[in-house]
From Swiss-Prot:
Residues 45-123 form the RRM domain. This is MKI67 FHA domain-interacting nucleolar phosphoprotein. The modification Phosphoserine is found at S145, S218, S230, S247. There is a cross-link at K38, K139, K179, K192, K271 (Glycyl lysine isopeptide (Lys-Gly) (interchain with G-Cter in SUMO2)). The modification Omega-N-methylarginine is found at R114, R284.
Amino acid sequence: MATFSGPAGPILSLNPQEDVEFQKEVAQVRKRITQRKKQEQLTPGVVYVRHLPNLLDETQIFSYFSQFGTVTRFRLSRSKRTGNSKGYAFVEFESEDVAKIVAETMNNYLFGERLLECHFMPPEKVHKELFKDWNIPFKQPSYPSVKRYNRNRTLTQKLRMEERFKKKERLLRKKLAKKGIDYDFPSLILQKTESISKTNRQTSTKGQVLRKKKKKVSGTLDTPEKTVDSQGPTPVCTPTFLERRKSQVAELNDDDKDDEIVFKQPISCVKEEIQETQTPTHSRKKRRRSSNQ
């Protein structure tokens, strides 16, 4: 059995005389086939999706929208600083008709306790670089310089940092002196003595403030209430309170040097008089009972 290898040769006609005409017909047929394929190619459609839950990833959203039709490209917008999703994405379907159907059906759809907003984007508004690097997997942004600066250092590493700052400070001062600029700026490294003095000052000021507060509180507790506000609540009329009021009235009268005479009656005598007035009623009742008997 003979085996054929290599690419297929050109199509030849059975009659060698009609070979030229046959090749022209073949070329025309091929053009028609290519034109039909171009006409059959579907125009893609892009859908703008909004109000997406923050916990969803690209793979989950891609698999969810792929049930409507073939998804050619997909992009979920994320923050460059944190890497978290911004809540909106762009989905490109193979056919424009499918994209319009998805936008109509999924608009105002309750998805993860949120109402989705889906809008069809016309091809004029779609940017060329909208789906740039869409197939590259997402990686959380890392800041090595920040991690390096915030890491815990040993004493030797701290001393090295201080030496570097001192060298930079010297170079700056030399450059300014060469250019004839008289400019004094604070040192890049704070001295320990200054920090200790500041802490001592802060503690002393705090102690003084606390002492003043204590004095104010003690003064308010020791001072008795000598006066009574007219607009305030009425005090309870106890015997001691009445005697105090009478003595105050007497002092005021003495100061004015009036000739009026004030009779001070003790409260006990008033009680005795009330008891004496009440006793005859009991005696009359007893007399009536004895007379009836």
